[in-house]
Amino acid sequence: MRFPRAVLFDLDGTLLDSAPDMLATVNAMLSERGLPCITLAQLRPVVSKGSRAMLAVAFAHLDAAAREALVPEFLKRYEALLGTQAQLFDGVEVMLQRLEQAGCVWGIVTNKPEYLAQLILPQLGWQQRCAVLIGGDTLAERKPHPLPLLVAADRIGVAATQCVYVGDDERDILAARAAGMPSVAALWGYRLGDDDPLSWQADVLVEQPPQLWEPAAWPQP
């Protein structure tokens, strides 16, 4: 058993628990409008779905067009709060260190706007460690389209079949399958109550990051 040659990760809900930053963002918007704040339990399941899904929870009384108009404000406020409360999930740093010690190259493919993801790397000390970063607006397509994963693999010089993609959302697994890339479903991430990770057909389902400290837990080529 050995670690993969390369691993690509989703960011929010996979490496980083960014839900507290997101909650602070939407609650600041609500408070400014004299509206009641929401709880982390209300927001957490949709964090991986993006800003529009979070605004749909926080501003459920508004129609889709009115919520769409709030997206720029959300992104601006989130940028100001970025990293103030977010933390790595337990076991992620050790997992990355063990991959690096084994000679594995790793990178990030996220649907978060690239400029926001780039701001996070220095906060985590990952500027030199993360071999590639593809955001949701880096290319013409985003997950679940396979293009971001294929481009990331190409940039690190590893065939897609020799990479593993780790993500906490069904679209992550769909993108990996379409790219011909083995996949790991990160069950510690953000999911809706009716999500069924078994139906995603990931190669491996993992409950917590420490399980990925050992090579045997990873999909083997």
Curated annotation (Swiss-Prot):
Catalysed conversion reaction: 2-phosphoglycolate + H2O = glycolate + phosphate
The entry's keywords: Carbohydrate metabolism, Hydrolase, Magnesium, Metal-binding
TM stretches of this protein: none
Active-site residue list: 10 (nucleophile)
Pathway involvement of the protein, from the record: Organic acid metabolism; glycolate biosynthesis; glycolate from 2-phosphoglycolate: step 1/1
Matching SUPFAM superfamilies: HAD-like
Highest taxon, organism lineage: Bacteria
EC number(s) given by UniProt: 3.1.3.18
Disulfide bridge partners, by residue number: none
InterPro entries: HAD-like_hydrolase_sf, HAD-like_sf, HAD-SF_hydro_IA, HAD_2, HAD_sf, PGP-like_dom2, PGPase_prok
Uppermost EC category: hydrolase
Cofactor names: Mg(2+)
Classification via Pfam families: HAD_2
Name listed for the protein in its UniProt record: Phosphoglycolate phosphatase
